[in-house]
């Protein structure tokens, strides 16, 4: 239960960090780092149209923008707004490896996946600038914290280049 409780507490923080970090494309702060990694945000002009998020067989009807950022060998994908957004962090390979997914609150349960925790699973496919991320997210229902919640999910999203 300790691992599940840590995930339930860390899940919203991961989601908020990814969504807010990926949606700050309008800020222009100079970088004093000599890092060779590049950051290239890409916001979809049509919002989340064409983006599909399905959790436990139900379309989540996401709205808002899609923001993708490549940095340090990862692709950060944020869909929707900071409060209700969906976020994913993938490796920049092909096929990409899923590092984390934050699905937000679904029916009172904060759902997500983080690689290496032994909870849930996720895989991704890349086709050009489009990603399909599938797996099983986990969460804790505080009404019954000893029973973990597992929900299948699918995310189809296109990042503009």
From Swiss-Prot:
A Pfam family reported for this protein in Swiss-Prot or TrEMBL: Myco_19_kDa
Keyword Signal: yes
InterPro entries from the UniProt entry: LpqH
Record keywords, A-Z: Cell membrane, Lipoprotein, Membrane, Palmitate, Signal, Transport, Virulence
Residues covalently joined to lipid (S-diacylglycerol cysteine): 22
Lineage of the organism: Bacteria, Bacillati, Actinomycetota, Actinomycetes, Mycobacteriales
Subcellular location, principal: membrane
Family named by the database record: Belongs to the mycobacterial 19 kDa antigen family.
UniProt organism field: Mycobacterium avium
PTM info: Modified by Lgt on Cys-22 with an S-linked diacylglycerol with a mixture of C16, C18 and C19 fatty acids, signal peptide is removed by LspA, modifed by Lnt with an amide-linked mixture of C16 and C19 fatty acids.
Annotated region described as Disordered, given as residue ranges: 21-49
Protein name: Lipoprotein LpqH
Compositional bias segments (type: Low complexity): 21-46
UniProt remark on domains: Forms a U-shaped beta-half-barrel with a large hydrophobic cavity.
């Amino acid at each position: 239960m300790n691992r599940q409780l840590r995930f339930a507490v860390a899940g919203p923080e991961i989601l908020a960090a990814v969504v807010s970090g990926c949606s700050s494309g309008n800020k222009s702060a100079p970088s004093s780092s000599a890092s060779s990694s590049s950051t290239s945000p890409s916001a979809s002009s049509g919002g989340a149209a064409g983006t599909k998020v399905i959790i436990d067989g139900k379309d989540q009807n996401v709205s808002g923008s899609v923001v993708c950022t490549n940095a340090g060998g990862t692709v950060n994908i944020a869909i929707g707004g900071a409060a209700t957004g969906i976020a994913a962090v993938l490796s920049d390979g092909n096929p990409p490896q899923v590092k984390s997914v934050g699905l937000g609150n679904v029916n009172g349960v904060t759902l997500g996946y983080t690689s290496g925790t032994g909870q849930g699973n996720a895989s991704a496919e890349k086709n050009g600038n489009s990603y399909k991320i599938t797996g099983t997210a986990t969460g804790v229902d505080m009404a019954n914290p000893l029973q973990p919640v597992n929900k299948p999910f699918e995310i189809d999203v296109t990042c503009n280049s």
